[in-house]
Amino acid sequence: MTVFDLYDMHCHLAFSPDTRAAAIAMRQEGIGGMCATVTPDEYHLASLALADELNRNSNFKLGMGLHPWWLSDGSCGADAVDKLVAYAAETRFIGEIGLDFAPRRAESAQLQRTVFARIAAASRGKVLSVHAVKSVGVALDLMESVGLVAPGAPQAPQNPQGTAVIFHWFSGSGVELARAIECGCYFSINPRMLSTKRGRAYVQQIPEEKLLLESDLPPAAGAEFNAREVRALLEASLEHMAELRRCRLDSLKEKVAANSRALLEG
């Protein structure tokens, strides 16, 4: 049995030219985690390609997603939303979903809000990987409105039946970070977050029990994928995080791995 000491809690193996081969390579490198998808159709194709890996590996999960970019550019419409809501019961893992209010996508903000609220309402008791660009406050408002999060409320794994919200590559304000922490959210950290002054400050503030790692790789459909490079990336992120937090690397590595296992196996 493969022993996993690293977990990539937000990757896009379905972007790889060979999704199954990418998942096998991750396992062989000792990396577990959560593979996000960007549309319900991509999820179903990936679930077929990864069936064997998902069955044999309790530390590797596939999330059903509907990325806000695909809504914003019209690639996905009402049918995709209906599919995700209808099939959400198939999996405990939802992602990548969320909101992106960057200027180039501002015109679709109301559509994004409506869709995100509907998906959130269908996602109670699940593990969610959430994309929130210039929209963390709105995302938290909408999740609170449907009972996914609440200040001071226990989240998985403390409450096995509860929801676990993971902010992927958090880029909100300090006030929004404090609110998300109070709501019990998790945060998956990647090198781009660590490359900014604000991101590094956030890594020092996030409670240890809410820290996760991510690669966000491959970066786009058809991009080549190298699991060994992912391992090196995750290791480098951990080293940087340990330096920032002034803690032992081995201790932080085990805690982040334990956080991930609790979500994946819960």
Q: What residue ranges belong to the model's regions?
A:
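Mid-domain alpha/beta scaffold segments of enzyme catalytic cores
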Residues: M1-G266
